[in-house]
Amino acid sequence: MIRLLFSFLLVLSVLTAPQRAIASSEFIEILNKNAALIQKSSSKTVAPVLEEIQSYGTRLAADFLIGWKNKELFFIKESSRIIRVDSTGKNEDGKKIVNISDAVTDEKLGIRLSKDVKQIKPNSGVRAKIASALVPVLLASEDIQDRQEGLDTLSRDIKSSHLEPLKNAIAAERNEDLKTRMEQAYIYASITHGENEDEIENAIFSLR
């Protein structure tokens, strides 16, 4: 039985590995196309990039957005490749060095001089836009702080695309206080963006 299970898992890993590679390749193409705006953008220019990344819709995209928002991403100056810095130090000549890996695939890229890479530092306006794009992911997180952040972000700028993930979050929420806040946000979101007249009417009456 154990041997059979091992064989199944081995076959499954072989079948899914190419799919992951294809997914990474497709996502990297999106990032390469938008590299300049990712490296330096404003709240006025970042929207199209976020829409394209968000529409990709996988955990890969969500992890990238989280890293971008938290200023955890860097890029290699000569190639514009987006990376993460795993550790820092100094070489034998006393020069600052960084140990880096690819931001999407986690491929280890070795050691570079610190001056060869640059941190991506989105300003507060861009980070707010990224947070809004992350709302569905944050609301579905197992971490209550993530869910609170998702709700806070949503409450500042409720969009029609937030209705479905908010509804799902309400059904799954275990914290009563947070669930009440979600329900209140859903009522206002339904009034603002709802397309079903009965749901809008029920939302209005629930305020009385």
Where in this protein do the model-derived segments appear?
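Bacterial N-terminal signal peptides
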Residues: 6-17
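Extended repeat-based scaffolds of very large eukaryotic assembly and lipid-transport proteins
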Residues: 23-208
